[in-house]
Amino acid sequence: SSAVSVAAATRRTIVLRGINFDFDRATIKPEFEGVLDAGVEALKENADVRVQVAGYTDSVGTDAYNQGLSERRANAVLEYLSTHGIDGSRLSAVGFGETNPVADNATDDGRSQNRRVELNIQ
């Protein structure tokens, strides 16, 4: 969790490593709640920042469908943060669909990495 705190204090974007979504899903898996809880603590320690929750998808599916899916993923994380003590006025959610991949969409592993959410510090 200290790595998340440092990231919150020193970087403009926090990549929630390990928070990846199943194909065609926007449900947060229970095994990822620890990472999100560390993010909650980092945000509580940095109460002056606003956060944009940005959702992404892999390249499978239409642009329009992936846009909606990325928005649902961002909203799922926003809801988690707000129900765990982060004031909703500090949070916004946006979906970027399949844009800005962090890995190669030609492989299963790459697609898995691209099904993600990032926190952008504002």
Regions found by a protein language model. Give the residues of each.
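Short amphipathic
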Residues: T13-R17
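N-terminal targeting leaders that direct proteins to extracytoplasmic destinations
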Residues: S1-A9
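Short secondary-structure boundary/capping segments
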Residues: R11-R12, D109
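Histidine kinase transmitter module recognition
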Residues: N20, A42-L43
